[in-house]
A protein has these predicted regions:
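A structural signal for short, well-ordered beta-strand segments
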Residues: 111-113, 208-210, 343
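Short Gly/aromatic-enriched secondary-structure transition segments
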Residues: 39-46, 224-225
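Glycine-rich phosphate-binding loop
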Residues: 339
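FabD-like malonyl-/acyl-CoA
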Residues: 128, 342-346
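C-terminal nucleotide
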Residues: 1-27, 52-85, 182-331, 346-386
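Gly/Ser-rich oxyanion-binding loop with an adjacent helix/lid
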Residues: 1-22, 28-32, 37, 41, ...
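Short, charge-rich binding segments
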Residues: 44-46, 54-57, 103
Length: 386
């Protein structure tokens, strides 16, 4: 993102005066899907694209926002009980309200912002927007007294309370805590986390966006969550001496004990989740050892599980995964909730050009459009630039 581009638009729309510039990144998740609501681990990293905002207090009670990308301007009062109707502005409004709850004495400000997170790629542009303004408000009005974790929770609460999205913590966590050259293992139960080195010399990390999103009848995500909870309930009934809250607490042996009772579908869902927990831990060990071949192997295993056990893949994503295998890609899997979106691929540099060319040609021939290619570089989290 170009600082001068954002600054020039800010100056144009707000009296020719400058403010402070802040940035927050989007994110990827290398491994650990559908584990958050099962009490498990996720493994995200911040990326080198995101949201950049220039912000300056204006001495009033009015917040004036300009979206550079949408060429749209919205104003609202700090204490407005309803907030703006524009969907993008509600993220800023929500962060203002949540930071006020944390004791930040937010006053009126002017802001212009832009983003270069690819839309529809599952890289969490909304979390980047929330995190950017949480960081800015903490700096400008809060004496930087609000902790990083409270900023993460403020972003999550914004989604819940003002945007109608019942999200987890991973997106905001990655945007706030990201560190260049590192991925993070987040324990979704305890909120403990650890940095792991991710400097794959000789490899590239790239997303292929299928450019599809299948709308399914019913509530496919809720159905899978219910399946997992049903398995836990049956295991808990067999082991009243233990404490079983999520699949995180269950063993492979206990899953086998209830296989007949829970039915094939629920068994497959739980089998994937237990396997994914093990795969995340295996990837941590592999990264510490600099073993990217094992990382890639676990990525392929996750794709198989998401496709065949959790059943959240689709024809297009499986097709891209098959192309990755055909081209000797080290690792490839669905990234995100499924039913469309991206594959995330770890590929050796010498194979990269051929892989991308083959994926574009074959996908275009079959589906009439090319997948979008998004090269990924692991970057820093939320920060003040100047």
């Amino acid at each position: 993102m170009d600082i001068e581009f954002v600054r020039s638009r800010f100056i144009k729309h707000f009296d020719g005066k400058t403010g402070n510039i802040y940035a927050s990144p989007g994110r990827i998740n290398l491994i650990g899907e559908h584990t958050d609501y099962n009490g498990g681990f996720v493994f995200p990293g911040a990326v080198d694209c995101g949201i950049m905002a220039e912000v300056r207090p204006n001495g009033t009670n009015t917040i004036m926002c300009y979206s550079i990308d949408l060429k749209d301007r919205v104003e609202f009062k700090v204490d407005d009980p309803q907030g703006p109707h524009a969907s993008w502005a509600r993220y800023i409004y929500g962060i203002v309200q949540e930071m006020k709850k944390l004791g930040v004495d937010v006053k009126g400000f002017n802001t212009a912002f832009a983003g270069d997170v690819p839309l529809g790629a599952g890289m969490s542009s909304s979390a980047a927007l929330e995190s950017c303004f949480a960081y800015a408000l903490n700096d400008l009005f809060g004496d930087n007294k609000v902790s990083k974790w409270d900023m993460v929770l403020a972003g999550q609460a914004t989604e819940h309370n003002y945007c109608g999205v019942n999200c987890g913590l991973m997106d905001q966590f990655a945007s706030v805590f990201g560190k260049e050259g590192c991925l993070m293992r987040l324990d979704c139960r305890s909120r403990e986390f650890e940095y792991f080195p991710f400097k794959p010399v000789g490899y590239k990390l790239v997303l292929l966006n299928s450019c599809v999103k299948h709308e399914l009848a019913g509530s496919p995500y809720n159905d899978r969550r219910n399946s997992c909870e049903n398995v836990v309930k049956h295991i808990a009934a067999k082991h009243p001496e233990g404490k079983y809250e999520t699949l995180r607490d269950c063993t492979w042996e206990q899953l086998e004990e209830v296989k007949a009772e829970v039915g094939e579908e629920d068994y497959k869902r739980a089998h994937f989740v237990l396997g994914e927990k093990d795969r995340v831990l295996a990837v941590c060990d592999a990264l510490n050892a600099g073993d990217y071949e094992t990382v890639g192997k676990k990525m392929f295993e996750t794709h198989y599980g998401l496709s065949q056990e959790y059943e959240v893949s689709c024809e297009e994503l499986d097709f891209l995964n098959d192309i990755a295998k055909e081209n000797g890609v080290t690792g490839s899997r669905i990234m995100g909730g499924g039913f469309g979106g991206c594959t995330i691929n770890l590929v050796k540099e010498e194979l990269y050009d051929q892989f991308i060319a083959d994926a574009k040609a074959k996908y275009s021939a079959k589906y009439g459009k090319e997948p979008k290619v998004i090269d990924v570089v692991i970057g820093d989290g939320s920060r003040k630039i100047c």
